[in-house]
From Swiss-Prot, chain A:
Family note: Belongs to the CcmF/CycK/Ccl1/NrfE/CcsA family.
Membrane topology recorded in Swiss-Prot or TrEMBL: Multi-pass membrane protein
Protein name as catalogued: Cytochrome c biogenesis protein CcsA
Keyword NADP found: no
Keyword set, alphabetical order: Chloroplast, Cytochrome c-type biogenesis, Membrane, Plastid, Thylakoid, Transmembrane, Transmembrane helix
UniProt gene name: ccsA
PANTHER family: CYTOCHROME B_B6 PROTEIN-RELATED (PTHR30071:SF1), HEME EXPORTER PROTEIN C (PTHR30071)
Organism of provenance: Guillardia theta (Cryptophyte)
Database matches in InterPro entries: Cyt_c_assembly, Cyt_c_biogenesis_CcsA, Cyt_c_biogenesis_CcsA/CcmC
GO cellular component: chloroplast thylakoid membrane; plasma membrane
Organism lineage string: Eukaryota, Cryptophyceae, Pyrenomonadales, Geminigeraceae, Guillardia
Pfam families referenced in this protein's UniProt entry, alphabetically: Cytochrom_C_asm
From Swiss-Prot, chain B:
Name of this chain's protein: Cytochrome c biogenesis protein Ccs1
Gene Ontology biological process terms, A to Z: cytochrome complex assembly
Keyword Chloroplast: yes
Gene that this polypeptide is encoded by: ccs1
Quaternary structure (record): May interact with CcsA.
Protein topology in the membrane: Multi-pass membrane protein
Family: Belongs to the Ccs1/CcsB family.
Main location: plastid
Amino acid sequence: MFNVQFDIFNFSNNITFLTLLISLISYWLGLIFKKIKNVFYIGYGSTILACITITIILGTRWIESGYFPLSNLYESLMFLTWGLLFSAIYLEYKTNLYLIGAIVSPISLFIVSFSTLSLPQDMQKAAPLVPALKSNWLMMHVSVMMLSYSTLIIGSLLAILYLVLIKAQQKKHSLKDFAFANLEFTFPKSTNSTNFNLLETLDNLSYRTIGFGFPLLTIGIIAGAVWANEAWGTYWSWDPKETWALITWLVFAAYLHARITKSWTGERPAYLAALGFVVVWICYLGVNFLGKGLHSYGWLN
Amino acid sequence: MNYIIKFLNKLNNLTVAIIILLAIALASALGTVIEQNKNTDFYLKNYPLTKPLFNFVTSDLILKFGLDHVYTSWWFIFLIILLLLSLTLCTITRQLPALKLARLWQFYTNFNTKAKFQIRFKTNSSSLTKLTYYLEEKNYKIKHFNHFVYAYKGIFGRVSPIIVHFSLVIVLIGSMLSTTQGRTQEAFIVVNQEKPVLDTYEAYVNDFKIAYNSQGLIDQFYSDLILETRQASKIQKTIYVNEPLNYSNITIYQTDWNIDNLVICIDNQNYYSIPLQFIELPNGSESKYWINRLDLFGQSVFCVVNDLTGIVYLYNQNKDLICISSLGEFITLNGHTITFNKLVASTGLQFKLDSFIPLVYLGFLLLMISTLLSYISYSQVWLVKNGSTTYIFGSTNRAKFAFIKQLTEIANQC
C-alpha cells in the first residue's frame, strides 16, 4: 500500500515538473515568435495538468496523514503553487490574456523545483502535528492565508509587468515593437468595439486580483487571531509573522485606497503593489528564517 | 478649537490616510527588526553608538523613541489614534453623504456632459425593451423614466466599504479596551491542590496527562479542571491546547507544564518527596529535563526525568548512567532498596478575564463579510433613445474590464 502511494507521489512530482517546464517554454515561444499562436494552447493545457498533479500530490498526503497537508514548508510551497496555477488558469480563462501564464509558469516552476530538489528529504516528509496545530482552525487559517498570498502575488506581478511595459513605452519603444504587442486585447470586431489596450487591461486586472486577495488576507488574519485567542488566550501578540501579515494588509490597503484617489492614477498605485510583492514574500518566507516567534513550526528544526 | 478643525480638515484626505497606513506598516516592520522588550544593557551592547544599524539606529535612538517597545510607545499609539480619526472622518464626511439616493443614482439630464462614462455606445435598434431585457438577464435592476432607462447593480459594493471602516473602528476600540481593562494571569497548579486565581475564582486540577503519538512525540496536553466561583458553582472540563474552558468572562487555557516532585521510597518504609529542578538546555533543544541530586548512604546520585512516562535516569557523580528505572520498580543501591513511587506534576494554565472579546469578535465578523462584499463592482447603465438610435452610457467603479466586455456583448446583440 505504502509503496503504491509513494509511486503515485513520485510520478506526480515528475509530471508536475515536466508540465510546468513545457508550459514555460510554450508560453515564451509564443511571446517571442508572434506567428505561432497555437503554442499558447499547449502552455495553457500543461498548466492545467500541473495543477491537477499538484492536487494529487497534496491529496495523497492528506489521505496518508489524515490532516490537511499544510504542516511543513514543502507542503506549504506546493499549496502556494497550486494557488498560483489555479488563479492563473481562472484569470486566463476569463481574459484570454496569455501574459498571465507567461509570468506564472516560471515562478511556479521555480517554487516546485526549489521545494522538491533543494529542500532536504526529511523536510519534505509529512510530520505529525504539534499540539498547538491540532485544530480545525489550521485548515481555515493556513489555507486562506496561502490562497491570499498566491492571489496577491499574481496581482502584484501584473502590476510589476504594467510598470515594466509603461517604462518601455516611455523610453520611446512603441508597444508595437514589443513582443507582447500581439496580445493586445481587442473585443469582438463590431461597430461598438472599445479600444481597451494592453496596459489598461493589465492595470485593471491587477487591481481586481489584488482586490480579491485583500479580503482573503483579511479573513486569513482574522481566522488566525480567533485561533490564537482559542489556543493561548490572546488574539494579537505582535509575533513577527503576525506583524508582517499586518504590514502586508496595510500596504495593500494603501494600494486599494490609492486606486480611488484622483491624484494617484497610473503608475503610483502600481509602485505600491510592487512593494506589496516584496512584503508578501517577506511575510511568507522571510520571517521564518528568523526562526523566532509562534509560527516557527515545521521549518528549520 | 479652530486649530482642531483645521487639523481634522487636513486629516480628512485620502493621501494623508495612505501615508498613515504606510507609516504604521513601517513602524511595525521596525519592531520586527529591533528586538523588543529587552533590558537597557542589551541595546547598549548590540546597538553601539559607534556602529549604527542602517547608519542611524543606535541605542540612543532606540531608548529615546521607545523602539525597544514599538507597539506600546506613545507615537505608535498616536498613529493608531490618527488612523481611527481618519477612518471616522472619512465615513462621516464622505462615505455616508455619498450614500444618498440622489448621488447614488446619477440621473443625468444632459448626456452631452463631460461626465466620465467608461462606455458610450450607439445602437440602431429603436426599442429599449430588448436592451432592458439583456440587462435584466445580467442581474441589473431597472428603473424606467420618461426619456431614458436607468439600470444598476452591485449596490453592496458601494455600501460595504462603509461597514469595513465601521468594523475597523469597532476592532480598534475593542482591542484597546481589552488591553486596558482585561487581566491575565499565568499559574502552575499542582495536581490535586486547590489554588485561588483571579478575583473570586478557584481552580482545582484533578489530573494532568500528556498523550504521546506512535513516534513518541507529544500529541496533546490534558488538564482535568474544576473551576469554582464564589457562588459555589463548579464547572468541570478537560481542557487541552486549542480547547479552553469558558465560563462567564473567564477563560482558562492550557499553556505549559512542569514536574515538581519525585516521590521516593527507601527500604520500603521511608517516603521522601524530592523537589525537581527544570533545566533549560542552552542550545534551545525541544527536550525538557528535570533534575535533582540525592545524597544516599554516602553516595551522590543524580535523578533525571524528562517526561511523565515514569522513566527515571540515575547518574553518578562522573555523569555515568547507573541505571534506568520505571516507577514502582525496585532497584538496589549500596545494599538498600529504592523505589520511585510517583511523579508530581503541575499544569501551567493561563487565566484571562476579558469582557470585550464579544465586541472584538463582532468587529471581526463584520470586517470579514464587508471586505469580501467590497469586491463587488457598482455598475450603472443609462439607455437613452434619440429618434432611431439608442445611446448606451455606462460607468462602473471597480471591474472596468469585465464591465466593458459585458456591455459590448449586450450592445452587439442588438
